């Protein structure tokens, strides 16, 4: 909150998570006048922004560039693949344990296969709720859907990430 993207002679400077500048973040949200503004763009405008984020942001020397996309196989995904294909990208699929999310991930996996995007593996996010008082993990939305999907599809299962209120609070305060 309160972070802004700055323009330099080399391009946009991403927002950094701390003074070490080890983790730079870029979001359309940083470019809006108000955090309550909506983004109502059609394909060409979205495609242009994707290209701008990849070419006009001063990323510096990167070990990794993590691109978080919504589930699905929209124009944005196709545009993104066209733009990053020369860099030999790889994907990590992220799901939640519910059946509807697993179904979305099957479509995403089908997309990666059709466009030749190698998948490193799958992560199950929101895999249980960690009680802030006793640290017990309750599986609110079930458990094991991600591991099961990974096994069925021949993917590496990279692990589970529970909902942790302490982490949520820390991120909100950052």
How would you describe each model-predicted region?
Residues 1-32, 47:
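Phosphate-binding loop that captures ATP/GTP phosphates
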Residues 171-174:
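C-terminal boundary of histidine-terminating zinc-finger modules
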Residues 17, 51, 55-59, 114-117, ...:
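Generic secondary-structure signature for well-ordered alpha-helical cores
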Residues 27-34, 86-90:
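A short small-residue
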Residues 64-169:
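Conserved catalytic-core segment of NTP-binding enzymes
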Residues 5-6, 14-20, 57-60, 84-86, ...:
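Solvent-exposed alpha-helices and their adjacent loops that cap or buttress functional pockets
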Residues 5-8, 47-50, 74, 139-140:
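Short gly/ser/thr-rich secondary-structure transition/capping motifs
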